[in-house]
């Protein structure tokens, strides 16, 4: 059952969809996972549906919502600050606590795609209500993320444009506006051709403040990931990822305590991995949440080898495709 809901976060009314598993509420409250979209994502993206189906089948509710300024949520659509999104996500956890169908002691967070994955880490690092975390293709350091998308000359041009914009905003009140896909990010060739996000691309703000880049510069999930332990963290990366370099996931993994796991998808690319590894990765995500969203007085902690790193690979099909 899916219920369209609204809740408030720092003065903005946010739109969400609460998906409940069969029998939720009739046999007691159920665990729930809150999901905020990835970079330039929306709550109703087709991309997320297989994840939700797996969690619902496991008896776990899902609350997916639009960040402020996106989709059906209120708020300024021109200024993208990941920390505003983190605040929205924490408000989503509070909303889940208000629902009688939900066990407020068994809340998890799931995020995918750049700031989506990074936000999941940031939320859990700041909010102990998140008892289990799955972060897919996350960023660890926003400044490094934007820097590595650019040739050095392009990076220096961005820094110069930001300096000029700061002066203009302070002296005139006017802000430079850019495309979030071209002026904040630099799209890879794969991003220009993929259809993975085609159902939401046309509903994303066309222009945002260039100053959004400065907010991303200040965004460092790696600074809080160590606070998650002893709650459970699973990170998912793509080897040789041209959009979100996998060493960001490695940096988060190294800094985190335990329980923790790093899953690395090989022989694929950032966007292709979603479909190529779906039937492998989705069960791992469901199993992680089932294992670690434990209620009552029983809590499961693990100590073991330093590396719980799993490399996933697909054997070539017949004919070599």
Outline where the language-model segments fall.
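Alpha/beta-hydrolase
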Residues: 164-224
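Catalytic nucleophile-loop/oxyanion-hole region of alpha/beta-hydrolase
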Residues: 43-45, 70-108, 275, 279-281
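The serine-hydrolase catalytic nucleophile loop
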Residues: 38-53, 67
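Primarily recognizes the serine-hydrolase "nucleophile elbow" in alpha/beta-hydrolase
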Residues: 91-169, 207-208
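Conserved alpha/beta-hydrolase "acid-adjacent" motif
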Residues: 242-248
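N-terminal cap/lid segment of alpha/beta-hydrolase-fold proteins
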Residues: 1-28
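Conserved alpha/beta-hydrolase
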Residues: 56-72
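Short beta-strand/loop motif that positions the catalytic acidic residue
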Residues: 228, 234-237
């Amino acid at each position: 059952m899916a219920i369209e809901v609204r809740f408030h976060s720092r003065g903005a009314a946010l739109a969400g969809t609460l998906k409940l598993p069969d029998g939720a509420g009739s046999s007691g409250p159920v665990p729930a996972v809150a999901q905020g979209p990835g970079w330039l994502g929306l709550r109703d993206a087709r991309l997320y549906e297989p994840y939700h189906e797996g969690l619902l089948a496991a008896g776990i509710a899902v609350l997916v919502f639009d960040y402020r300024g996106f989709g059906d949520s209120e708020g300024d659509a021109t200024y993208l600050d990941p920390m505003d999104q983190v605040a929205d996500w924490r408000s989503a956890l509070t909303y889940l606590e208000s629902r009688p169908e939900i066990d407020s002691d068994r809340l998890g967070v799931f995020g995918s795609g750049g700031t989506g994955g990074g936000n999941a880490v940031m939320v859990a690092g700041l909010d102990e209500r998140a008892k289990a975390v799955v972060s897919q293709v996350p960023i660890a350091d926003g400044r490094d993320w934007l820097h590595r998308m650019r040739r050095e000359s392009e990076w220096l041009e961005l820094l110069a444009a930001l300096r000029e914009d700061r002066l203009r905003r302070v002296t005139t009140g006017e802000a430079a506006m850019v495309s979030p896909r071209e002026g904040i990010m630099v799209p890879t060739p794969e991003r220009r051709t993929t259809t993975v996000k085609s159902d939401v691309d046309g509903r994303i703000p066309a222009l945002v403040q260039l100053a959004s880049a400065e907010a991303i510069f200040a965004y460092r999930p790696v600074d809080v990931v160590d606070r998650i332990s002893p709650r459970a963290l699973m990170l998912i990366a793509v080897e040789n990822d041209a959009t979100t370099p996998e060493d960001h996931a490695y940096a988060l993994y190294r800094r985190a305590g335990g329980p923790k796991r790093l899953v690395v998808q090989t022989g694929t690319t950032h966007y292709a991995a979603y479909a190529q590894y779906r039937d492998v990765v989705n069960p791992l995500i469901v199993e992680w949440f089932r294992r670690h969203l434990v209620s009552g007085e029983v809590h499961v902690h693990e100590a073991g080898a330093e590396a719980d790193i799993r490399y996933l690979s697909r054997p070539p099909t017949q004919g070599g495709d």
